[in-house]
Amino acid sequence: MLRLALLVLSSMLLAILPWRPQSAFASPPKQEMAFTSPQAILGWINQYRSRPEPMRLPLAVKAMSALGVFRDLDGSGVYIGFMAGVLGANPQKADRLITAMFPMPPEDQVAVVRGIAYSGLPDWRAVLQRFSERMPARAILIKRLIDGKLPTLEKLPLDTSPAALDTLWGYYFASGRKEPVDRIIDALQWATEGNSVDKLTAGSMAKWTLANNALQRKDLLDHLKAEKRRRPKAVADQLAEVIEAAETYETSQIRKRALAAIEDLKRKGPESARKMSYWGMAGQTALALGCVVAGAMGHVEIAVPCVVGGAASSAAIKMLTPQ
């Protein structure tokens, strides 16, 4: 009888209570940034360290593949570096994260291979070997990386490709580790280079991206100040200008002076210095455009990091080429 009475009472209460859909009682779901464009992915990368979400990496990597960012070899550095940084910062989850990135088109597997090789995981060679069966089309690349015939992140040359500089930035954005930043600081020795346009461009891009990213990140600015005290005078002087530009929000002066120096060397320097590779042209284009193309074209509300690749893409170069 007691059970019957309780059932009747419950039915009466349900009848007099106003009905609401279940969703009305549920807490609102967390808003997650959708990876609908390269700019949206860059926005997520930019704020990642304030809210790390390593388990979203596979979804982001699949979006990168679908959006075609890996196929722009010079523009994909920040994405590959970021992938490597997340894997390196989460060694216990690395296998699970990589597994969830598959299936992946063979042409985009190069990015996954490099992401693993650049991760800094203590056993990255073993990890790469484990996943080699899923990437038979990349067997030669995998073997050369494992055998040490291709450089890993800490040995990538900075004066031959914009991708190397961006890859270091991507790793830093994911992990907060200072080793990639220190390599970028090393390139400041070329900021006054008088014998190679490529090296002058690389040094200028290092200086420009350091200033713009330090402007957004206090921990990075503090690290640059600490490095200034221990670096040789030539690099310390460049760091002083970077710090001043970041603290006064006057980074445009670095860009203008760099462009003028490159043009001057091309015009007046010895013939050997005037020769400019694709990297030199792409880097100069990136300086001319600033971080705008790497940022959100038409989406200024999305904060993005300052990287070279977006502005060094073929589309950006076309924008500056007379039609």
What residue ranges belong to the model's regions?
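Signal peptide processing junction and immediate N-terminal pro/mature segment
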Residues: 16-28
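Non-catalytic all-alpha helical scaffold/repeat segments
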Residues: 25-323
